[in-house]
Regions:
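Positively charged n-region of N-terminal signal peptides that target proteins for export
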Residues: 1-7
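Short N-proximal segments of mature Sec-exported proteins
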Residues: 102-116
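Sec-dependent N-terminal signal peptides
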Residues: 7-16
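Surface-exposed patches in mature extracellular/periplasmic domains of secreted proteins
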Residues: 52-56, 95-104, 143
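Long, amphipathic alpha-helical surface segments
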Residues: 21-51, 63-67, 75-94, 115-174
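Early exported N-terminus immediately downstream of N-terminal targeting peptides
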Residues: 55-59, 63
């Protein structure tokens, strides 16, 4: 029950205009008043947290350092924000064919990796979530919640993250 209270408190803060300090320096009028992309950025910042040298190869808000990238610890919040937005934009482009659902899919992929959704053509098949969307079925809440495992075990905090992403980014009216 305490975890549910924390989640409700977090959502209350976001809806009422309070956001974690590190997540945004601007004054918010509630997360629902923000454009969906900005909501996604705040959700990712909140759940990824700040990655330091001990989290290598991740830096900032969960950017995975790629071969050839000249990134050194520590980085500024501005650099981390820029990396997050660049990564999220690339993921949105990857899921562009899913139109209104591309941002939600990009958020899941930011956390799990795009291969978990798209499949890798070898061992990992295309996800049931994408197969449903391909069939025109947008009843995907349960499928979104399945992306909550780490090393095969369900993780409650990741499940809460999926719940928040779905409720703040999914538009059922489309």
């Amino acid at each position: 029950m305490p975890n549910n209270v924390k989640l409700l408190f977090f959502i209350f803060l976001l809806l009422c205009g309070g956001a974690p300090q590190k997540a945004s320096s601007q004054s918010l009028h509630g997360i629902k008043g923000l454009p969906p992309y900005e909501r996604a950025v705040l959700i990712i910042k909140h759940y990824e947290g700040w990655h330091t040298k001990k989290d290598y190869p991740y830096i900032g808000y969960g950017h995975q350092i790629q071969p050839g990238e000249n990134l050194r610890y520590p980085i500024t919040e501005t650099q981390a924000d820029s990396l997050l937005r660049s990564d999220l934009t690339k993921l949105c482009a990857m899921f562009r064919k899913y139109e209104a659902d591309s941002l939600l899919l990009a958020c899941i992929a930011y956390n799990c990796g795009p291969a978990r959704l798209l499949g890798d053509g070898k061992r990992t098949p295309k996800s049931r979530l994408l197969r449903k969307l391909d069939q025109g079925n947008r009843d995907i809440f349960a499928e979104c919640l399945t992306f909550c495992r780490y090393k095969g075990r369900p993780i409650p905090s990741i499940r809460r993250r999926r719940w928040v992403e779905f409720h703040l980014l999914f538009n059922p009216c489309l």
